[in-house]
Amino acid sequence: MTAVAPRVDGHVAPQRPEPTGHARKGSKAWLMMTTTDHKQLGIMYIIMSFSFFFLGGLMALLIRAELFTPGLQFLSNEQFNQLFTMHGTVMLLLYGTPIVWGFANYVLPLQIGAPDVAFPRLNAFGFWITTVGGVAMLTGFLTPGGAADFGWTMYSPLSDAIHSPGLGSDMWIVGVGATGIGSVASAINMLTTILCLRAPGMTMFRMPIFTWNIFVVSVLALLIFPLLLAAALGVLYDRKLGGHLYDPANGGSLLWQHLFWFFGHPEVYVLALPFFGIVSEIIPVFSRKPMFGYVGLIFATLSIGALSMAVWAHHMFVTGAVLLPFFSFMTFLISVPTGVKFFNWVGTMWKGHITWETPMIWSVGFMATFLFGGLTGIMLASPPLDFHLADSYFLIAHFHYTLFGTVVFASCAGVYFWFPKMTGRMMDERLGKIHFWLTFVGFHGTFLIQHWVGNMGMPRRYADYLDSDGFTIYNQISTVFSFLLGLSVIPFIWNVFKSWRYGELVTVDDPWGYGNSLEWATSCPPPRHNFASLPRIRSERPAFELHYPHMIERMRAEAHTGHHDDINAPELGTAPALASDSSR
């Protein structure tokens, strides 16, 4: 079904009150520190996450600069170890995970018609303890022994008090625990909000795909983050109280790997699934079509969540202590529901009236990049290939294609998509496209070539290599493109600041024109409790039906949903005007 008809709902543009500027000095900072509004906390999460992302990117540039030529340039081996440890930690636990809760905080209550999250104070606690945990980890750089240097996977015995005796390592472990507590708090909040605060008519199978994905991610987070916290406390117990939980002499090294990866691989899907949801919200809007295979997408998400708990040991093939056929088969199997998602995304775009606004470009960039990462993941699921490629730069390339391709591309798509809803202003399309192409070219130039150098045998986590190894030209190409990737954040930062202050004002509920979920049925930005009134929810596309009531009968007929008895239900009447007045 293609929707191209003009609006006929008598829409009234909302009045946007401008700030007077008469508040006391410092009052904004105090309100920010004490707020429990899910929208403000969502924006704070996103800003905090991108701040850590920029810092982690600087660490990555130092790593790539060191590897530009053979020999140690300006970093010692110890400093190199600290940088790749903190780079991985910052990107995964201080950027990738918090930005999930940032988008969830802002968008999810709006999508289900809730006035706020279920536990506003717990929400604020989760944000601040995550921030404090991140600062604690990074403060390790200021300690005498430097920051943690045992890798973000914290393998034993590298993480014991003998091999990593510094205070920075202890602060890293405490910081990991704090960020884990913040994620558990957010997961409890999102899960309870979804189950208890949905608007009338918002059944589970009328929820947006993004909300469904956050639901599954919250369940996963409640299963895995307490395990990470307990395992990390065990490391602290060994370091400070002389325990032997992870002593290699009694198999403790393998125990740690099992505990860590039982957390670590589901965590990959905690990072990925929300961004699958973001892309699933964007593609229908700019394809002018409903999501193809809505129910199939939901069951694919549920399947990925379930299977993600059964594949952790594919990270341990080279230990020789896991059942190779089982974990290899499960890893191959989890690619099936992921393939279903790609099929649905492509099916949504098929014969649609596609327009290439910035959010859509980022979404297609996500699809291309993540698809390549998924294909190399299938290669690594084969034990014979994994034996050859383990701990090489092939693994680094696969990991970045999978996570950078998912988290960065889709989070940028989400920012460009929901920025008008958050701020009431449009972002600059030209700067957004410059940002995309610099990122796309810089990323693929940096990491595509690492597949080849990894296959040639270059190991990861080495600060140096020999000229005779033949790795030099590959590393130089990768480093040059990495600096292009680093430069790509400049138009993004400028776009955000420029648009926040001077961007085109949004005077309608749905600036994209074809939004489906409920956040597009209230003003930009929404009022304190989100809605003055809610439209009737009769499908998974309530905002579209609100703005295009003349198409409801056609949508029901083409969707074959069996809800034809709703066609003759009372019309929406003045609901559009009420929704538009929600900024008063």
Curated annotation (Swiss-Prot):
Keyword Oxidoreductase: no
Region (Disordered) residue spans: 1-25, 564-584
GO cellular component: plasma membrane
Cofactor: how and how many bound: Binds 1 copper B ion per subunit.
Name of a matching Pfam family: COX1
UniProt record, GO biological process: electron transport coupled proton transport; oxidative phosphorylation; respiratory electron transport chain
Residues at which heme a3 binds: 398
Top-tier EC class: translocase
Domain of life: Bacteria
EC assignment: 7.1.1.9
Cell location: Cell membrane
Cofactor: Cu(2+); heme
Keywords annotated in UniProt: Cell membrane, Copper, Electron transport, Heme, Iron, Membrane, Metal-binding, Respiratory chain, Translocase, Transmembrane, Transmembrane helix, Transport
Binding site for Cu cation: 265, 269, 314-315
Catalytic function, reaction form: 4 Fe(II)-[cytochrome c] + O2 + 8 H(+)(in) = 4 Fe(III)-[cytochrome c] + 2 H2O + 4 H(+)(out)
Pathway: Energy metabolism; oxidative phosphorylation
GO molecular function: cytochrome-c oxidase activity; heme binding; metal ion binding
Subunit organization: Associates with subunits II, III and IV to form cytochrome c oxidase. The 4 subunit cytochrome c oxidase forms a supercomplex with the menaquinol-cytochrome c reductase complex (cytochrome bc1).
Similarity comment: family membership: Belongs to the heme-copper respiratory oxidase family.
Entry protein name: Cytochrome c oxidase subunit 1
Source organism per UniProt: Corynebacterium glutamicum (strain ATCC 13032 / DSM 20300 / JCM 1318 / BCRC 11384 / CCUG 27702 / LMG 3730 / NBRC 12168 / NCIMB 10025 / NRRL B-2784 / 534)
